[in-house]
């Protein structure tokens, strides 16, 4: 089981590297964030099932709820940005500007 956990951790690291490399487009960043959340969900589920901790059995479901909320907010932001600016480049966003 250690090799499965290692592969899932590597998938998380690869998705994190994708966020750092493909940060020019918002859609690419959102896809990499979803990959990170999916690998975290699988890792938490496997760790809970391996350790037989019944008190934390709701944690994967809570993680899925937060992942769905993150996806919804991200897609709403993507639609708003693409209708306002005409593209999804992250360079157009300057959130510190008044």
UniProtKB/Swiss-Prot annotation:
Species of the source: Thylamys elegans
Lineage top rank: taxon: Eukaryota
InterPro entries reported for this sequence: NADH_UbQ_OxRdtase_chain4L/K (IPR001133), NUOK/Mnh_C1-like (IPR039428)
Matches recorded under Pfam families: Oxidored_q2 (PF00420)
Protein name: NADH-ubiquinone oxidoreductase chain 4L
Keywords associated with the record: Electron transport, Membrane, Mitochondrion, Mitochondrion inner membrane, NAD, Respiratory chain, Translocase, Transmembrane, Transmembrane helix, Transport, Ubiquinone
Function: Core subunit of the mitochondrial membrane respiratory chain NADH dehydrogenase (Complex I) which catalyzes electron transfer from NADH through the respiratory chain, using ubiquinone as an electron acceptor. Part of the enzyme membrane arm which is embedded in the lipid bilayer and involved in proton translocation.
GO molecular function: NADH dehydrogenase (ubiquinone) activity
One Gene Ontology term from the biological process aspect of the record: ATP synthesis coupled electron transport
Location in the cell: Mitochondrion inner membrane
Membrane topology label: Multi-pass membrane protein
Catalytic activity: a ubiquinone + NADH + 5 H(+)(in) = a ubiquinol + NAD(+) + 4 H(+)(out)
Subunit structure: Core subunit of respiratory chain NADH dehydrogenase (Complex I) which is composed of 45 different subunits.
Enzyme class: translocase
Lineage: Eukaryota, Metazoa, Chordata, Craniata, Vertebrata
Gene name of the record: MT-ND4L
């Amino acid at each position: 089981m250690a090799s499965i956990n290692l592969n899932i951790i590597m998938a998380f690291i690869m998705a994190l590297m994708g966020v750092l490399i493909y940060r020019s487009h918002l859609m690419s960043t959102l896809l990499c964030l979803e990959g990170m959340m999916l690998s975290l969900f699988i890792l938490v589920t496997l760790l809970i099932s391996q350790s037989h901790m019944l008190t934390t059995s709701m944690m994967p479901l809570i993680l899925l709820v937060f992942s769905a909320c993150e996806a919804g907010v991200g897609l709403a932001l993507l639609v708003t940005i693409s209708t306002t600016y005409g593209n999804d480049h992250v360079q157009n966003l300057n959130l510190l500007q008044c």
